[in-house]
């Protein structure tokens, strides 16, 4: 008899509190955790927390990397950060700590832990985001219904959505006219990179449209460490991170954004070419 079957057979006769304290029943009891969202994707987690969460909201979900690995998705001010949670078979590992049971793991979150990453941003985990939320059973009635196009088929239905892929943190930026370096707060959402005077500023100094960016790469011309640049037709922006790891993270996510943008543009061009061929 397997471990899961054994646990299932004992579930009705044992006190649930005893099961929560067991080291071998961790993943089976995750289903009873109200803020465990199962196989929720990274994209869906970001959309959920950004649209309906608040600073300090978090949820636990399956990681798509390997069995026994989970992702803790946390809402910061303007982004969602993801952290690994590992189940070893007898304990949960998160951050610098290891918990011998799910009960101890959850108790840690009940005490509102403070965590920080390479960005230097500190977050207090205050608000577990529930898997189930009450919703009204209200539907709209269709009053107008017609087709705006003709001659299209199911092949024209290509689901597309911009990747959220959020990130935020302080970077040191070189000025445009006066080549001095100033520390600014940067946020990345969808295809926009914004920078602010500081983290508390309500309005950005500038918004950069990444659809106009042609390249992101490490830079060694400014005689500064952890420096990288964004190339636009009108200007090259030079940015420096505090650490090499942080610079690498910014470069990776920005390059990933550019690859997605180019892919969407290529798909759009292919669609236009195929339609022009049909109507020739």
Swiss-Prot record:
Induction behaviour: Upon B-cell activation.
Domain SH2 span(s) in chain numbering: 35-129
Keywords in alphabetical order: Cytoplasm, Membrane, Phosphoprotein, SH2 domain
Modified residues (Phosphotyrosine): 139
Domain PH: 164-259
Its membrane topology: Peripheral membrane protein
Entry superkingdom: Eukaryota
Compartment(s) of residence: Cytoplasm; Membrane
SUPFAM superfamilies xrefs: PH domain-like, SH2 domain
PTM info: Phosphorylated on tyrosine residues.
A single cellular component GO annotation: cytoplasm
Molecular function in Gene Ontology: phosphatidylinositol-3,4,5-trisphosphate binding; phosphatidylinositol-3,4-bisphosphate binding
Sites bearing Phosphoserine, chain numbering: 141
Function summary: May act as a B-cell-associated adapter that regulates B-cell antigen receptor (BCR)-signaling downstream of PI3K.
Subunit structure: Interacts with PtdIns(3,4,5)P3 and PLCG2.
Name the record gives this protein: Dual adapter for phosphotyrosine and 3-phosphotyrosine and 3-phosphoinositide
Organism: Mus musculus
